[in-house]
């Protein structure tokens, strides 16, 4: 428990060793939206706990991207810093459990941090992938500078576009993609019905959903029946 990025919050390694029994500790941190998280510090701490040494050029780009992901000029109440925080932490726990390779660790954290970077305001339903394509356009100069080459960028682009919620990805051999797609979904449902409704309330406000939050959450669960979780640890994380 040496690496603590929030007061009284244990390290990723500690949580991973006890997962899913340690889920209640993560719930308290994930569900709290009182304090704005330091996404740069959080990302560095998660990488450190994953035994990844972050060199200066990468640190610099990560800091700039963390700052951009902390911007919330449309006052999003769901796709905000707290959603990024949740995806980063849970993805890091899964990466630790699955013993991800070194270069995959920074790739995963980068995707977890930035996958909804330009998801500002209401989704434009008439234009599929609108927010995702905006995110990729903004990300490209940062990511190419220190993180990836063209081949890896194609992989990065594919994974990020597959986070588009209506898209159904039946199978993939990409371990980073499996983690990100699963975590992006289960962080809204793995902490039980009551917490699912709390998160639905935040999303309801953001997308100006006219019906009640129960209807929104039911609709979310209904859509999930068409999708599937790719990892056994994801399924165990959602078990009561």
Kindly label every feature range from the protein language model:
Residues 2-44, 77-85, 89-102, 114, ...:
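Divalent metal-dependent phosphate-bond-processing catalytic cores, especially two-metal-ion Mg2+/Mn2+ enzymes
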Residues 37-71:
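Short alpha-helical hairpin
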Residues 57-62, 98-105:
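Short N-terminal amphipathic alpha-helices
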Residues 61-69, 108-115, 156-164, 179-184:
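Short alpha-helical scaffolding segments that buttress acidic/His motifs in well-ordered protein cores
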Residues 70-73, 78:
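Conserved P-loop NTPase mechanochemical-coupling segment
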Residues 76, 84, 91, 107-108, ...:
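Histidine- and acidic-residue-rich, metal-dependent catalytic cores
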Residues 123-130:
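Metal-dependent catalytic cores of enzymes that make or break cyclic nucleotides
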């Amino acid at each position: 428990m040496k690496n603590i990025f929030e007061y009284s919050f244990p390290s990723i390694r500690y949580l991973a060793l006890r997962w899913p029994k340690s889920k209640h500790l993560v719930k308290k941190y994930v569900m709290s939206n009182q304090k704005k998280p330091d996404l740069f510090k959080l990302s560095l701490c998660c990488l450190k706990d994953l035994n990844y040494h972050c060199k200066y050029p990468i640190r610099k780009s990560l800091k700039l991207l963390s700052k951009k992901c902390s911007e919330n000029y449309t006052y999003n109440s769901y796709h905000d810093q707290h959603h990024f925080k949740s995806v980063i932490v849970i993805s890091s726990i899964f990466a630790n459990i699955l013993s991800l390779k070194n270069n995959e660790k920074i790739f995963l954290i980068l995707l977890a941090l930035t996958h909804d970077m330009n998801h500002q305001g209401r989704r434009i339903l008439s234009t599929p992938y609108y927010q995702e394509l905006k995110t990729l356009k903004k990300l490209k100069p940062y990511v190419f500078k220190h993180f990836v080459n063209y081949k890896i960028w194609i992989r990065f682009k594919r994974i990020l576009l597959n986070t588009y919620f209506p898209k159904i990805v039946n199978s993939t051999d990409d371990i980073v993609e499996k983690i990100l797609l699963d975590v992006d979904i289960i962080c809204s449902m793995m902490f039980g019905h009551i917490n699912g409704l709390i998160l639905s309330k935040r999303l309801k406000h953001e997308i100006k959903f006219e019906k009640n939050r129960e209807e929104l959450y039911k609709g979310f669960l209904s859509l999930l029946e068409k999708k599937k979780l790719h990892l056994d640890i994801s399924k165990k994380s959602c078990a009561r």
